[in-house]
């Protein structure tokens, strides 16, 4: 069980950050966001390799010390997240790196090892796989095209999907490929299974496993990382 592979799709542009480079290459404390994310995955005792999918013309990755790490593998990503994940899966399956993969957002540097371990334990015992998720706590409203409230949505069964998301590499590869062939919109790995009527497990994860999408998220991620370092 100690040879899991993590996949990090990192070919996105992240235009909402309004920065001069993709958000995964913005500086967070003393490193890039991507370095924090990948190094954190590598430090988990059950993860052997991390496959990073970046744009073919990415000018940043090769300049990171991370690019030369013996357990980090670079592959070309695609236009959409699903394309990048599929490219990484092709490598994992071709080289038989591991039976299972954990797909994790490049812009989520704050995931805890405890959450990763709980995800792995749950996924291995489930027939399909599992994802980290956080129960919705806020009151949810459905709006119309004028941004007016239509009604309040029952939040009882609603979850925020987080990452990592863990599935068997071959199963995820087959489902992603089939969905893309049918032009099905795939927003995360679990949705490739949902499309087939399959139900991955939900693993309650920490809400501080935030995804950096807005400029203010950098400051919050810095706080979480600094706090976690003090605790360790």
From Swiss-Prot:
Record GO terms (molecular function): 2-C-methyl-D-erythritol 4-phosphate cytidylyltransferase activity
PROSITE patterns, per database record: ISPD (PS01295)
Alphabetical UniProt keywords: Isoprene biosynthesis, Nucleotidyltransferase, Transferase
E.C. code: 2.7.7.60
InterPro entries: IspD, IspD/TarI, IspD/TarI_cytidylyltransf_bact, ISPD_synthase_CS, Nucleotide-diphossugar_trans
Matches recorded under Pfam families: IspD
GO BP field: isopentenyl diphosphate biosynthetic process, methylerythritol 4-phosphate pathway
Reaction(s) catalysed (UniProt annotation): 2-C-methyl-D-erythritol 4-phosphate + CTP + H(+) = 4-CDP-2-C-methyl-D-erythritol + diphosphate
Site (Transition state stabilizer): 16, 23
Pathway of action: Isoprenoid biosynthesis; isopentenyl diphosphate biosynthesis via DXP pathway; isopentenyl diphosphate from 1-deoxy-D-xylulose 5-phosphate: step 2/6
Family: Belongs to the IspD/TarI cytidylyltransferase family. IspD subfamily.
Protein task: Catalyzes the formation of 4-diphosphocytidyl-2-C-methyl-D-erythritol from CTP and 2-C-methyl-D-erythritol 4-phosphate (MEP).
Record's protein name: 2-C-methyl-D-erythritol 4-phosphate cytidylyltransferase
Gene: ispD
